[in-house]
Amino acid sequence: MEVPRLDHALSSPSSPCEEIKNLSLEAIQLCDRDGNKSQDSGIAEMEELPVPHNIKINNITCDSFKISWDMDSKSKDRITHYFIDLNKKENKNSNKFKHKDVPTKLVAKAVPLPMTVRGHWFLSPRTEYTVAVQTASKQVDGDYVVSEWSEIIEFCTADYSKVHLTQLLEKADVIAGRMLKFSVFYRNQHKEYFDYVRDHYGNAMQPSIKDNSGSHGSPISGKLEGIFFSCSTEFNTGKPPQDSPYGRYRFEIAAEKLFNPNTNLYFGDFYCMYTAYHYVILVIAPVGSPGDEFCKQRLPQLNSKDNKFLTCTEEDGRLLYHHAQDVILEVIYTDPVALSLGTVAEITGHQLMSLSTANAKKDPSCKTCNISVGR
């Protein structure tokens, strides 16, 4: 079942007791997590309702979970409702002046356990939460008898599933625009980066863990290893732009060296950074590689010859490449890439740091690139 939200109803088990309002609960006060009741409470005397214990959380998704617990059989038949206190786990490093998330208080009828708690308006992907439970018995006058709070349990919600990513993919399809020809992938970095690759990695760029840019629920952030490339071209020249936010030195490599019939293509994310520009993250993985296996389990696979973002087709024995015009593609290649397969040269344009997407946070209010999952 889906549990309804009680916005201003239950007192938190981690705070002093407060009156429950709405839902005809005006006269009730709940215990805090230490089991203390207000001395002047209007609540009926507790009749030893069983306290939930041995709480189990499973079937966790990015916006739902199942919860169950054990309880003594004594007075079990008098339980009519469950009160659930759900809070984001406190981040000690968070900005103290930032508005705190309002704790979510849920009330549910006493259905058979396990019970599903679902709601994208109060559950965010890849986020740590604490949860505690009370049992309650509704009286004829509308008041409740409640148990003490259970122990506090911690859990973390999951990443976006393939289903959620497919929803993002469908939204990205809408704005991708027409396709433009291109012939090279490129990667900008500082000169020191390429010197380090030559001196310490045998002249081969190595995959590294993807940063946390993009959607908060993306399954590749902080997990997928790869090398970042671009393929955007200037409309009037058909060549890569001379400006870059990532460094004045550019490695260029022929497109067929990275993207060919021996690789698979995956959709990774769709996001923006409070601007009109939208970004699509794609992953290219050699067939059967560790990166390919990682993506196959987590990401929607694209038809390399027919999709709205990046294509590789054959014509007269040659491979032709096209990229979407109206989104900025960020391409992640999951294997090492030898510098000898391409060229490194200094660009003639500017280093536009303001356009960097390193650890960029997605605009959660954008209707173009958000789905109804998490906040």
UniProtKB/Swiss-Prot annotation:
Record family assignment: Belongs to the PHYHIP family.
Function per UniProt: May play a role in the development of the central system.
In-chain residues carrying the UniProt-annotated modification Phosphoserine: S11, S12, S15, S24
Full protein name: Phytanoyl-CoA hydroxylase-interacting protein-like
Keywords, sorted A to Z: Glycoprotein, Phosphoprotein
Any single Pfam family the record assigns to this protein: PHYHIP_C
Gene Ontology cellular-component annotations: cytoplasm
Keyword Ribonucleoprotein recorded: no
Annotated Fibronectin type-III domain residues: 51-160
UniProt entry tagged with the keyword Glycoprotein: yes
Positions glycosylated per UniProt: N22, N36
InterPro entries per UniProt: FN3_dom (IPR003961), FN3_sf (IPR036116), Ig-like_fold (IPR013783), PHYHIP/PHYHIPL (IPR042868), PHYIP/PHIPL_C (IPR045545)
